[in-house]
Amino acid sequence: MINRTILVGRLTRDPELRYTNGGAAVATFTIAVNRQFTNQNGEREADFISCVIWRKAAENFANFTHKGSLVGIDGRIQTRNYENQQGVRVYVTEVVVENFSLLESRAESERHQAANGGSGNNNYNNGNSNYNNNNNGYSNQGQNAAPQQSSANNNNPFGNGNTGNASSAAPSSSANNNNQADPFANNGDQIDISDDDLPF
């Protein structure tokens, strides 16, 4: 059985970082994902998907993202339920994030934030950061969230800045040392890609 979710979209609000009674960090946020088709008015509609991320990855996510940030999310869908203070059973469906990537540069993110009048967090790692969240699940009964242990997962479908043929595309000069975080910084050079490597 497969339960895998990959999303690319923008945050609808700043991530909300909290800590469980056991001291584990947990951040919740909502990501807006545009649909692939347009409605009758020619506009693209969006789906708003609730997400949760745990531990150190949650702290990193909260520190490096803000409302409007473009992110890639890799995780799984989870449905849980709890009884609220009024005694009503509440069902929640959300994506438990295992990996994420920041998909825009610091300058683009700041430009987007300024255009929207936001005042989020400005701590970035040049737009090429990838984070793994090794928590594969949790149970949450109201305020007493308790993380479950799981094996480490280092698979990242969004890649990291050091994979692929980026090294063959970069010149061997001192400028290369300054651009290691951005494999596409030397955009004037040719890139050796065969037709078999292209997804279309």
Curated annotation (Swiss-Prot):
Organism listed in the record: Lactiplantibacillus plantarum (strain ATCC BAA-793 / NCIMB 8826 / WCFS1) (Lactobacillus plantarum)
Assembly behavior: Homotetramer.
Motif (Important for interaction with partner proteins) on chain: 195-200
Region (Disordered) residue spans: 108-200
Bias (Low complexity): 121-187
HAMAP family tied to this protein: SSB
Keyword hit for DNA repair: yes
Role played: Plays an important role in DNA replication, recombination and repair. Binds to ssDNA and to an array of partner proteins to recruit them to their sites of action during DNA metabolism.
Lineage: Bacteria, Bacillati, Bacillota, Bacilli, Lactobacillales
Any one GO biological process: DNA recombination
SUPFAM superfamilies xrefs: Nucleic acid-binding proteins (SSF50249)
A Pfam cross-reference name: SSB
Protein name per its UniProtKB record: Single-stranded DNA-binding protein
SSB domain sequence ranges: 1-104
Alphabetical keyword list: DNA damage, DNA recombination, DNA repair, DNA replication, DNA-binding
PROSITE patterns for this protein: SSB
GO cellular component term, pick one: nucleoid
GO molecular function, one term: single-stranded DNA binding
